[in-house]
Amino acid sequence: MTLREMNMGEMDSPNEYDFLKIAIQRGLVTEQDEIAQFKRIESGRKGENAFAEIIKQFAQENWLFKRNLWLHDFSDFECDYLLITTHCVYVFEIKNYFGKFEYRNGQCKSRGVAITYNPVNQAHNATIHLRNLLGGVPVKGVLVFVGEHNQVVIHDDIDYIDILCRNDVYQYIQDIISEEKQSAIRIDTQSIISKLRNQTINNPYAIEPFASADMTEENSGIFCDRCGAILTMTRKIYINCQCGFEEYREHLIIRSACEYSLLTYGTNFTVSAIHNFLGNVLSRNYLKSILQKYFTELPSQKILTFKNSSQNNVNQIVFDKPNRIILHQNRSYQ
């Protein structure tokens, strides 16, 4: 089954995880506190991805979803995962903790250490805000502890949100399906989407983009999309990495250009900028032809310039050849 993702018309700022991953790889971010912050974000992203895969596997095809949606209702708040069925709206707060999480008297501890943020309150607040925005539409708040090695102990009575562990998610989805079939309620999905769009905001904590001048020779080059190793550009159709990943040459070029677009979001880019970003390893004419093939040119520019937008996503582009992983047995797999 294929869930449908809602288009809420957000602005073009990238998410912090993608931005920092590329910036750290290219040496644009080197401070240890920023790298530690990235590790925390990475853990959260892995948890959200794991949850999204479970939902995708078992959800109904007529349901709608949106990840990491920022909304405003007197104050700004984020919905980690918003799910709209035909009878109810569900807002999921997702936590990827390791070890024991304990909740007692409104206080949280993770592996015996008190933590300042309160995921129970986060889930409850998002639920209250959504109910305010959507009027009489049924809204349920759910806190999901998705960590594989996470023990959750809740001492307090909590009846205002549902609390799940990873192994509970499948059955929770089955319960939603059963409730949907039995419910006499049918909500107006288009009205809900319209209300949400009116209150959608860009991430208020968006990070500052880099300028083209920030990109030096030290930050240039090409990297493996699978393991992050530095690669050597060749004239072959596929660029090989020692990890076994073979990336289609055009895919590698466009992926790198998309990474540049992300790091400098809000600013359009030129052939020269991408040429430098790749480490000057391609002829300008060849690079120009590839960029013209996949990106939108801006008219009336003295220098050939391409539009930088959130649509510059290599995963949304269809290439005429696939990437490959070559195993020791010399068999290739998509």
Language model segments and positions:
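Surface-exposed interaction regions that form or flank ligand-binding interfaces
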Residues: 1-77, 113-284, 288-289, 310-334
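Catalytic centers of nucleases
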Residues: 70-91, 307
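Short acidic, glycine/Ser/Thr-rich loop/turn "cap" segments at secondary-structure junctions
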Residues: 104-116
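Short, solvent-exposed alpha-helical "recognition" segments
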Residues: 290-299
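Short Lys/Arg-enriched helix C-cap and helix-to-coil transition segments
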Residues: 298-314
